[in-house]
Swiss-Prot record:
Keywords: Chromosome, DNA-binding, Nucleus. GO terms for biological process: chromosome condensation; negative regulation of DNA recombination; nucleosome assembly. Residues 140-161, 192-234 have a biased composition (Low complexity). The lineage of its organism: Eukaryota, Metazoa, Ecdysozoa, Arthropoda, Hexapoda. Residues 122-133, 174-191 have a biased composition (Basic and acidic residues). The keyword Cytoplasm does not apply. One of its GO terms (cellular component) is nucleus. Residues 44-118 form the H15 domain. Gene3D superfamilies: Winged helix-like DNA-binding domain superfamily/Winged helix DNA-binding domain. The gene is His1.1. PROSITE patterns: H15. SUPFAM superfamilies: Winged helix' DNA-binding domain. This is Histone H1.1. Coiled coil: none annotated.
């Protein structure tokens, strides 16, 4: 009886231990892929193609950029180990020369100097990395929040200033309209004054022309004087003839 009691009492302990081991094993198995996913950090630099194109473009060397200059530029700007990336850089340069995206001005293989072609210059704009994009998004959201706060205050100020400007502009418009109305009234008054003055000048002209009508009377009176002047001349000529005839008879 004692042996059976010990066996029965020990069995639940073994069962609990086995269940605990299973739970631990399941937890470990489930945690490993998640930990791998979480630890896989995004790359801190863009692809080698973009880095090489950007370095050649920004170095702006007339004879072309050498491999050492490209490595130095990549290490300084992107803060990565350029020596580890050297085989990838060489491979890209060879493929780019074969495709025509890069022109090799000196040397052979990856040891010479390189220039971007005309088509590659257009497409060589460096794209921001994923980390830079995230930081830009965070900064942009913070900037938007600050801008929204400042914009509300500025909109209130702008609204008050706009109301003041509107009131000032309305008053200025009223003054301008009043001035225009006064000018129009003055013009109308001048026009009416000139129109009223015109008939007086016409009347003066008519009164001045009326005395000219008696001129024909003076012309009719002049021939009468001429006729009276001619008759005495005829009598003066006839009288000497009569005197000569009486003298001959005597």
């Amino acid at each position: 009886m004692s042996d059976s009691a010990v066996a029965t009492s020990a069995s639940p302990v073994i069962a609990q231990a086995a269940s605990g081991e299973k739970k631990v094993s399941t937890k470990k198995g489930s945690s490993t892929p998640e930990s791998k996913k979480s630890t896989a950090a995004p790359p801190s630099h863009p692809p080698t193609q973009q880095m090489v194109d950007a370095s050649i473009k920004n170095l702006k060397e007339r004879g072309g950029s050498s491999l050492l200059a490209i490595k130095k530029y990549i290490g300084a700007t992107y803060k990565c180990d350029a020596q580890k990336l050297a085989p990838f850089i060489k491979k890209y340069l060879k493929n780019a020369v074969a495709n025509g995206n890069v022109i090799q001005t000196k040397g052979k293989g990856a040891s010479g100097s390189f220039k971007l072609s005309a088509s590659a210059n257009k497409d060589a704009k460096p794209k921001a990395s994923a980390v830079e994009k995230k930081t830009k998004k965070v900064n942009a959201s913070a900037a938007r929040a600050t801008k929204s706060k400042s914009s509300t205050s500025t909109t209130k100020k702008a609204a008050g200033a706009a109301d003041k400007k509107l009131s000032k502009s309305a008053a200025a418009k009223k003054n301008v309209e009043k001035k225009k109305a006064d000018k129009e009234k003055a013009k109308d008054a001048k026009k009416t004054g000139t129109i009223k003055a015109k008939p007086t000048t016409a009347k003066a002209k008519s009164s001045a022309t009326k005395p000219k009508t008696p001129k024909p009377k003076t012309t009719s009176a002049k021939p009468k004087k001429v006729v009276s002047a001619t008759t005495p001349k005829k009598t003066a000529v006839k009288k000497p003839k009569a005197k000569t005839a009486s003298a001959t008879k005597k």
